[in-house]
């Protein structure tokens, strides 16, 4: 098949009309139809926030990657734009893989991975991944400039460039695999076209994965943050439970030096579905991150409905006093709020109480006084398939989903400080939940698949009492 932007647009127009919207998001960004995965090219340009994304418009399965495109004035209300890149070759004939965007003067520049096979695609020895450039003056139509960084000798997995400006130079990091070792490689340039190899910024130790995808590198509170998505890390206890992870290292770096780590790798989001996050800086200097709200090799029931995958809410990043990355919903998310429904504040004693009969798009705010709560489990139930609760015996907040008909069952959890209040902001959309714990202390994000009409929200406390001190919900529009 020959891939072009015009052909992709024709297919999307047709497929959009046939969608089943039962699980399609109300306020998260998803493709018009077809497949979406990694967010790409997050940037502010010419008065708009732009979000590109990995996209296969021809089916709900992963396939030759295009770059989908949307823009927004406020990070929450998105306008779909034409597909920005199609794998038209020769450098990207088998896919336009992930990358980033920068503004150079009056030009928006996309730096992305050209994915191609020289020979049988079933033989990894034939895989080549190179870094390519495309430019635009209007932010919508892009002119392909071809390859700007070739594959290092002997390497096959070399993808997901992230570019930034520092001093008089442009810098690029690229995720790579050297044998069975994940690494991040560094390049520098004066003009975004001629790049010099600056060596390896950092690489995995034996337990840190065979491939580091989607790297990002930025400064918070004077510290350098290396964010990436490692493949090949083994689960250990409550950690690394997903097939692949997304997390970060904190450290120091100066141009011309190697990254010096301070501390260990930490996961960013402890839910079932969060991968390939990318960050960018807003005009007022905030660092915002958006991730793919799904996980590789996990069932996607919405594929039968004509679409697959979605992106997370925009989240503002900060660094805690003990150098932990914190995520909170970007302030723009509050513009979605409609009516406020206060819930009665009370002590629940071995009971369950329905608060909302039909939750489609809501933000729920809860505060529990854990010191005055004796229940073994207390929290929130959504329909028949989701519970978000405090497990007092383990001192952990648990997200439990149970959709056996789709093969989606299991728990994810984070530790909590004994006796402290538990403050939750929980965002429900048609097929997703994002839980923000204690103003950025932790986050759990998962896809959910409730069956109509079982979308009620209920508070519960079992084997004892639980003290609820603040409660209510915003209708999101």
Model-derived regions: residue spans:
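Beta-rich carbohydrate-recognition and catalytic domains
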Residues: 1-161, 165-212, 219-270, 291-342, ...
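Repeated scaffold domains used in trafficking and secretory/extracellular systems
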Residues: 213-215, 277
């Amino acid at each position: 098949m020959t891939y072009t932007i015009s052909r992709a647009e024709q297919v999307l127009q047709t497929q959009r009309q046939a969608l089943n919207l039962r699980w399609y998001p109300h306020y998260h960004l998803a493709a018009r139809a077809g497949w979406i995965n990694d967010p790409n090219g997050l940037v502010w340009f010419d008065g708009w926030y732009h979000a590109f994304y990995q996209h296969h418009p021809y089916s709900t399965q992963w396939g030759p990657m295009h770059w989908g495109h949307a823009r927004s004035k406020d990070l929450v209300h998105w306008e779909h734009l034409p597909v920005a890149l199609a794998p038209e070759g020769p450098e990207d004939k088998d896919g336009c893989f992930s990358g980033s965007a920068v503004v150079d003067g009056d030009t928006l520049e996309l730096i992305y991975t050209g994915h191609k096979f020289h020979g049988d695609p079933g033989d990894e020895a034939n895989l080549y991944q190179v870094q390519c450039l495309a430019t635009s003056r209007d932010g919508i139509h892009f002119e392909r400039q071809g390859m700007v960084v070739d594959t290092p000798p002997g390497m096959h997995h070399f993808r997901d460039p992230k570019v930034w400006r520092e001093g008089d130079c442009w810098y690029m990091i690229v995720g790579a695999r050297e044998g069975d070792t994940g690494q991040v490689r560094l390049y520098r340039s004066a003009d975004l076209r001629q790049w010099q190899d600056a060596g390896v910024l950092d690489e995995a130790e034996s337990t840190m994965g065979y491939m580091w995808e989607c790297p990002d590198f930025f400064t918070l509170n004077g510290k350098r943050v290396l964010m990436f998505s490692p493949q090949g890390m083994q689960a250990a206890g409550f950690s690394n439970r997903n097939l692949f992870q997304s997390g970060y290292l904190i450290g120091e770096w100066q141009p011309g030096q190697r990254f010096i780590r301070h501390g260990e790798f930490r996961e960013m989001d402890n839910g079932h579905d969060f991968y390939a996050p990318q960050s960018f800086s807003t005009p007022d200097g905030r660092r915002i991150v958006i991730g793919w709200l799904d996980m590789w090799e996990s069932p996607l029931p919405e594929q039968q409905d004509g679409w697959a995958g979605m992106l997370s809410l925009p989240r503002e990043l900060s660094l805690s006093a003990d150098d932990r990355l914190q995520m909170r919903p970007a302030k723009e998310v509050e513009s979605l709020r409609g009516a406020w429904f206060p819930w009665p504040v009370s002590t629940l004693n071995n009971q369950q109480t329905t608060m909302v009969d039909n939750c489609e798009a809501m933000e729920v705010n809860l505060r529990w006084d854990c010191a005055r709560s004796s229940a073994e489990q207390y929290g929130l139930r959504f329909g028949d398939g989701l519970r978000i609760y405090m497990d007092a015996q383990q001192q952990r907040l648990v997200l439990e989903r149970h959709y056996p008909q789709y093969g989606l069952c299991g728990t994810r959890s984070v530790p909590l400080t004994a006796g402290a209040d538990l403050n939750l902001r929980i965002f429900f959309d048609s097929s997703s939940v994002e839980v923000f714990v204690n103003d950025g202390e932790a986050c759990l994000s998962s896809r959910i698949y409730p069956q109509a009409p079982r979308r009620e929200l209920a508070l519960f406390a079992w084997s004892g009492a639980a003290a609820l001190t603040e409660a209510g919900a915003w209708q999101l529009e």
